[in-house]
Amino acid sequence: MNAAPTVLQQQAQSLSEAVTQPIPGSRKIFVQGSRADLQVPMREIALTRTPTLFGGEENPPLSVYDTSGPYTDPQVAIDLAVGLAPLRAHWIAERGDTVALDGLSSSFGRGREHDARLDAVRFPARRLPRVAREGANVTQMHYARRGIITPEMEYVAIRENQRLEAVTDASLRKQHPGEAFGASIQQRITPEFVREEIARGRAILPNNINHPESEPMIIGRNFLTKINANIGNSAVSSGIAEEVEKLVWSIRWGGDTVMDLSTGKHIHETREWIIRNSPVPIGTVPIYQALEKVDGRAEALTWEIFRDTLIEQAEQGVDYFTIHAGVLLRYVPLTAKRVTGIVSRGGSIMAKWCLAHHKENFLYTHFEDICQIMKAYDVAFSLGDGLRPGCIADANDAAQFGELETLGELTKLAWKHDVQTMIEGPGHVPMQLIKENMDKQLRECGEAPFYTLGPLTTDIAPGYDHITSAIGAAMIGWFGTAMLCYVTPKEHLGLPNRQDVRDGIMAYKIAAHAADLAKGHPGAQVRDNALSKARFEFRWDDQFHLGLDPEKAKEFHDETLPKDAHKLAHFCSMCGPHFCSMKITQDVRDYAAEHGMDDAQALSTGMQEKSAQFLAQGAQVYRPM
């Protein structure tokens, strides 16, 4: 490392205030686990007292799931050039089944490490990777199948419960019954239940042993619905500092995992900066980087190049790999009559390779070799849907479902090696065909977690595909999808900027939460109930703070009612002071209380009084001023 900080290191000394300031109205809290070093972060939203007019009771703070890591904690000094604290390092080391290497195993990684020309963009702190001891398997699935509850499993159990036991107000606990379509929704998540779900293959806990900075989370249909955000540079846009900032921006608004899809310069170095500063799991599509190593010529790819890329990324700490092993030679002709053919970048790369060599996909033929690498680092499979439909006309065709059947076959093979696995799904699917996708995935893949891109429910809205896809995402999340991959307004049009990322995440947080409500996930409705109570009581700041995007809510309110006094007003800009339905309802309740009646009696009596008053004034609709 150079003695003087590089330009990149200077940029990385701090992030912009917009992505590191605390989220309005809340603070970071930590829930203590069974051991001193197991503290689970949550976001506690402070609530104000109910106005005397509405009863005057205290409203206790509400805890919610938090993906933002230490970036929203004012007690933590952030230095991107150092990276985050290795939260899980001791848990990994104490298991005694891994060893620290003397250096990188990947030939590409070693070459980058010794290239002085990269000093200006290299992550400053050198970290030696770990790997499983000879003959060991270090996956969370392996531990789970041996009856071991790891600290990571306890961590996610605490996290999923969101301190629901602290909510004692029965009105906040009220919840409509859900329809879970056969899912095993629990009233309370226990560490043992987490272990059982991972052992069964119905959930994954993606935590590479070389990403100790990550805060454990779980993906499975019996848990909260998660969302993924994509970032990554390209040959024409964005540098390392911008990508790290996009990472932090993504998790601030609720990204549960982030995929680095970089295809431009310095892919290796960009990924190192991202992983060292990420409190959430990081996923990649290794074939993208492998293609860069052969100058973009798909036919020049080899198993040896791909294998070296897997090891390179596993030793950096990538938590899950998208592997397009289901794109088989026999399926490629099935796409010929499609409207949009093969739209997956990874799928098209492997299809081109298969056709160029007229051989079976080497990711398929070497699948068990890949499993050996995955279990040595605890990298999870995200089995890619390389033949997903790129328009609703192509939905649910033979190519898509043929690949899905192969992914089911590969899932069972991965499970034989105790490798955690989830399945990627479409794509573009009209609403009436969505459930068929979910049902077939559950059947073919043994209930392994489904991870879907949308699906987009119509093709006519370029610029608004975060909406067209959030509709499908809410539906498929309700039917059983475990994680939803966000779509931004720039989908099909260009690379997203920071605002596009925020808009995409918000659309998908809404979809995921709507799915949890529909499934009947325990406590899912508490936040809705708390916000509704705040709305009825005109606690404006509490309404903002309980929302998914407090800053946007306040910004919209302030456009028409900017004064501080308006935060105490018993009306909003939509109806004004005289036509607010909630104010009228409260007036009825006050009248009832004053006259010892129930609400219905008060409304009837009040109407009679108003009728008499109207007649006494001459029964004129319009009175002269």
UniProtKB/Swiss-Prot annotation:
Pathway: Cofactor biosynthesis; thiamine diphosphate biosynthesis. Its EC number is 4.1.99.17. GO terms for molecular function: 4 iron, 4 sulfur cluster binding; carbon-carbon lyase activity; zinc ion binding. It holds the Pfam family ThiC-associated. GO terms for cellular component: cytosol. GO terms for biological process: thiamine biosynthetic process; thiamine diphosphate biosynthetic process. Binds 1 [4Fe-4S] cluster per subunit. The cluster is coordinated with 3 cysteines and an exchangeable S-adenosyl-L-methionine. It catalyses: 5-amino-1-(5-phospho-beta-D-ribosyl)imidazole + S-adenosyl-L-methionine = 4-amino-2-methyl-5-(phosphooxymethyl)pyrimidine + CO + 5'-deoxyadenosine + formate + L-methionine + 3 H(+). Its cofactor is [4Fe-4S] cluster. Substrate binds at residues 230, 259, 288, 324, 344-346, 385-388, 424, 451. Zn(2+) binds at residues 428, 492. Catalyzes the synthesis of the hydroxymethylpyrimidine phosphate (HMP-P) moiety of thiamine from aminoimidazole ribotide (AIR) in a radical S-adenosyl-L-methionine (SAM)-dependent reaction. This is Phosphomethylpyrimidine synthase.
